[in-house]
């Protein structure tokens, strides 16, 4: 039986080993992307001086809006519990665009964008640097190759476990040692065998979750195992697009109204009492109730990690183990700021949780910094396994030929 599994292990590993190395290594680099970015770009992510209180939300966002082209609008804001961290302001376009803003001065600190190095690593990890054809036509070869390699990695890991399985307790103890004093060949052998066993659970978790991004059929089957039906992306996209169009129409109307009222305000400013604060921010601003919403949620959730607000919706996330994308969700009336619906995470359907769990397990942040470090080490071992395997295989071939 083990002889069959040895052949499976070898002949699945040889053609795809280098790809697995690239995918695992790039994945390891991405584990601490946020920390590295914040270390090198602290001026972008953090404010220079923490003051007693930030600017009112409507005034802050209106100030940001004046720096944007007419075709771009503010769609949301994310506020950290850390008073020294800059607000992240979401924009209508391009997709997922956002700015970091000093909430105490209104200064736009810069764009939120992936560095060239980490974008390179991400494209390597997901698509082997390939790009999808315009119009999504044809086969996305990079994505396909990564998916097939990841699927085969699952069988390689399982076959490796069968080959490794010791018969005695003494053999188990010896098979989990890595010896560095008996020559390079013994070291690479121990690293391949023992290192593979130490990383096995994490590598399997990363592979099984990662496949949900590669193959729709696998994603459907994976979801069904947990009793969840895959939501139709097309319907979701249409609904989101419709909501976005409504929001942009409302914001465009606000911009036009503000533009038309500029001359009137200029004429009235000289007659307005000095203590009258009823300017363009107080009534016409689409952000007029956002500060009130934030204050309510902050009082209700003193241990929050981040509060995000957009037109008619808000969410609160926490520093907890488990699904790192978990959040309590709220809907509110944009005309009076009253909450209309509350959806606490614990009461949400499985369909609203599983994607966050998949991501959290895949990147290893479900257990905080400890599991992230273990995931990083496991991914590096995953990158080393094919290389040590090639070394041992070539050594064996040379020995046989002699």
What are these regions (language model features)?
Residues 1-402:
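Conserved histidines in hydrophobic membrane contexts and catalytic metal-binding motifs
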């Amino acid at each position: 039986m083990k002889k069959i599994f040895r052949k499976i292990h070898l002949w699945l590993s040889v053609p795809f080993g280098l790809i697995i190395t690239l995918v695992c290594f790039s994945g390891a680099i991405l584990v601490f992307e946020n920390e590295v970015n914040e270390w090198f770009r602290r001026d972008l992510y953090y404010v220079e001086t923490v003051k007693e209180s930030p600017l009112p939300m409507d005034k802050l966002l209106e100030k940001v809006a004046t720096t944007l082209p007419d075709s771009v609008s503010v769609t949301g804001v994310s506020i950290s519990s850390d008073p020294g961290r800059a607000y992240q302001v979401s924009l209508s376009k391009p997709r997922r665009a956002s700015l970091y803003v000093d909430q105490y001065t209104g200064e736009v600190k810069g764009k939120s964008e992936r560095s060239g190095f980490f974008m390179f690593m991400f494209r390597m990890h997901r698509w082997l640097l390939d790009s999808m054809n315009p119009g999504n036509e044809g086969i996305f070869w990079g994505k396909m190759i990564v998916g097939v390699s990841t699927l085969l990695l699952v069988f390689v890991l399982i076959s490796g476990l069968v080959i490794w399985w010791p018969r005695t307790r003494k053999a188990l103890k010896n098979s989990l040692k890595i010896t560095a004093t008996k020559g390079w060949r013994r070291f690479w052998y121990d690293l391949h065998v023992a290192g593979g066993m130490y990383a096995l659970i994490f590598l399997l978790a990363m592979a099984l979750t990662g496949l949900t991004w590669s193959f729709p059929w696998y994603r459907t089957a994976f979801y069904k195992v947990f009793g969840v039906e895959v939501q139709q992306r097309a319907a979701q996209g249409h609904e989101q697009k419709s909501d976005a169009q409504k929001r942009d129409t409302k914001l465009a109307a606000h911009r036009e109204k503000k533009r038309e009222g500029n001359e009137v305000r200029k004429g009235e400013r000289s007659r307005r009492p000095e203590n009258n604060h009823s300017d363009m921010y107080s009534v016409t601003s689409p952000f007029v109730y956002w500060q009130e919403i934030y204050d309510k949620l902050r009082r209700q959730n003193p241990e929050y990690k981040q509060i995000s607000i957009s037109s008619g919706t808000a969410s609160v996330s926490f520093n907890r183990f488990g699904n790192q994308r978990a959040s309590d969700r709220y809907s509110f009336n944009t005309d009076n700021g009253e909450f209309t619906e509350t959806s606490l995470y614990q009461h949400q359907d499985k369909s609203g949780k599983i994607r966050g769990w998949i991501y959290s397990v895949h990147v290893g942040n479900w257990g905080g910094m400890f599991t992230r470090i273990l995931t990083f080490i496991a991914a590096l071992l995953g990158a080393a396994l094919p290389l040590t395997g090639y070394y041992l295989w070539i050594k064996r071939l040379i020995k046989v030929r002699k």
